[in-house]
């Protein structure tokens, strides 16, 4: 494989990286995110990036210790306790109750991706794990997927994040915080069983190693169950060890590994809406003799943190990723379905994908006091490199395979011995990104100001060779872009804090449209105003905001291309709306989380005039969520938790042209019951049981890309979890 095209400024990049790496020779550093004890209490007025080594939280929005309630931008936190209560199996499921997020865009049977949109803009599988991007093959299927067993919490940051993270869409981003080493010894063993023959075992162990300055965390799980779709399975094996070495009072090294093997991940295919209306969620348009999705992901990383003194510190966060994927599947074109008879013409294909990637982020932060003004300064340099390849093949099959009827599906028609390769293509893919960023987080009394900027250099290439040479070629991008953000928040002293921000975003674009015209980089901007409220006891919170986002030169699939591979540049898309998110304790033993989102999204300018005034797909105008827990604290049922939620998603456009109808709204109810078995007997101290029923009333719903490509939502599932901690 050819190496990635280097930057012309690569020598400068190396010099900058060397400058930031020099302190590592003199002393080791500390992981901040990966060393926060789970029971650490956070100071709500803390501005220092680092005060006590390993015990301060850095939020995604600012890469500093600024608390979410002090951040002049929308932030949603989903902690481990909520993840466990809801029994989630993916980040997709974890985001079901997050305001402004539309998740599971390809339904429940397609579980191999965490695909969702924030404030109307798709994230394109760009998730972050402990502050570093999870690399992915753009336009292909290879995306690492972090299992909730290894997650401490999930942060959803609303609005543009390019000022600190570079190439990101304007709607927002998700950062997954890993479970980290702890000094206090604890071990938890879990078993689960449930619908579709679910069997799962998990382990979570942490503690100090003897009397040494080493502490560890070991997370592992094995899970297997049938897919929602007939004839498919889901299977996963995960191990994620990590180690903290407290070298000195001011220096800590964290080393972490994440290995995940997915021998089977369900099926990756769609169906016409007419089939959805007639069939059950278990129906499949695929073939059991050609249904494979295997993925292997290895990530090895480290964090080095060093405090020079009480005010200045340096953090380096790095990760190497080696990932591969192989799938056998079928697909159909828009023109391949006859609604009157149910005849569906399918194509047979495989993809074989792999990549290696390195990501590194260097952060120098310091607190400078000038009179009554405190400046928390942050300067950073990050770099990422990906080198990958993918191959795609199509086959002609036996005659019986082409007699498939979607209304009466027979999923056993394909004869592998009669396959004949008819087309193949291979892609050599690579990209490099170098970013330099700065930020000044200012406090003056009750006023918090935030200002920052970032300059990115991005290059990518995609070299294609195929059995049809007329389609061969090389797609490249070469973009330099400056992004920035300003924001302000004022604490009125009664728990109420109004805020406002303006931020810009940047996304690279490679290749050409269907007419051969080069695609421009995508940029965006957001204006947001709102307020945050927190009661004096920190029990009740409320965030309300109005946002207006404009994305320029937005890229979408060309609706006139039946293969969905050609792209068009829309010109300008706006998204504006209102988000409300609150938490309240109605009693000491009764908590409620609720949110509402109003979203108005529209294509304002487009090269295809028929798209002007349309609403993109996966955009409900109204959505709302509510989750509650009630704890019984006395009597025979003491230790019982009764929890549940309701989530509503409004109707959405079925296709990009807004001519094929609407995807109906839906309301889904979930139930969660927990019990601390230690209340029944002292001998059972540490044992807990949790019963989760998702989609309690078995509501049937679906999502669509267009009328010939739809996916069922999650049907009712029941899961029983038993955990024993000691």
Where does each model-flagged region fall?
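Structural signature of Gram-negative outer-membrane beta-barrels, strongest in the C-terminal barrel
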Residues: 244-248, 355, 374-376, 382-386, ...
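Gram-negative outer-membrane beta-barrel transporters
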Residues: 446, 569-656, 700, 723-725
